[in-house]
Design a protein with these regions (language model features):
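Mature catalytic domains of secreted/periplasmic carbohydrate-active enzymes
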Residues: 1-180
Length: 180
């Protein structure tokens, strides 16, 4: 009696229990710092499973002695997670009272295509700084080829950002938004 998840109708308790078990396995095996749910879990009917997963993840992290976060799109987790905005244009324009993150591709597509139009390193740095000043962050999506290699033009953008962070990183890391 659950709404569609990833286009499959309806979701049975057996399917959702299997999903929960697989998520717990990933948590146990890899102890991730960040668990990111892209889409497909936004339905309120899935809240019992999501709440158990969040409880398990945060309690596990406590025992590991590390801080972790869940990140999700839309309102999948109304509280206790970092809200994700897909693409820079959807990011908050003012300082938000909650942490958030934009996932934005290095180019005009999330995957690799021939002739991918890339953002400039300066534009990406500007977005990163703007996001941080508004209580947000930037998750930059790169677009490797099918063999896993990162094209040279994308590598150069990443190196340029890396050089900038090496010089100005102190002004970025540990920075928090502040209203005057």
């Amino acid at each position: 009696d659950h709404e569609a998840v990833e286009g499959r109708h309806p979701q049975s308790n057996a399917f959702l229990s299997e999903w929960e078990m697989r998520v717990r396995e990933i948590i146990d095996r890899y102890q991730p710092d960040l668990f990111f749910f892209d889409n497909g879990i936004n339905y309120r009917s899935l809240d019992p499973w999501k709440q158990r997963i969040a409880q398990y993840y945060y309690n596990s992290a406590y025992h590991w002695g590390k801080e972790v976060s869940i990140q999700s799109k839309s309102e999948a987790y109304p509280v206790g997670s970092i809200k994700d905005y897909e693409r820079q244009g959807r990011a908050p324009k003012e300082i938000a009272d909650h942490y958030w993150q934009v996932d934005d591709p290095i180019g005009n597509k999330f995957g690799y295509i021939e002739g991918l139009k890339l953002q400039s390193a300066n534009g990406i740095i500007r977005n990163l700084v703007n996001n941080i000043s508004r209580n947000g962050n930037l998750c930059l999506n790169i677009s490797p080829k099918s063999d896993g290699t990162i094209p040279d033009d994308q590598q150069e953008i990443l190196r340029t950002i890396g050089r900038w962070l090496k010089t100005y990183g102190e002004a970025v890391y540990e920075t928090r938004a502040y209203k005057i």
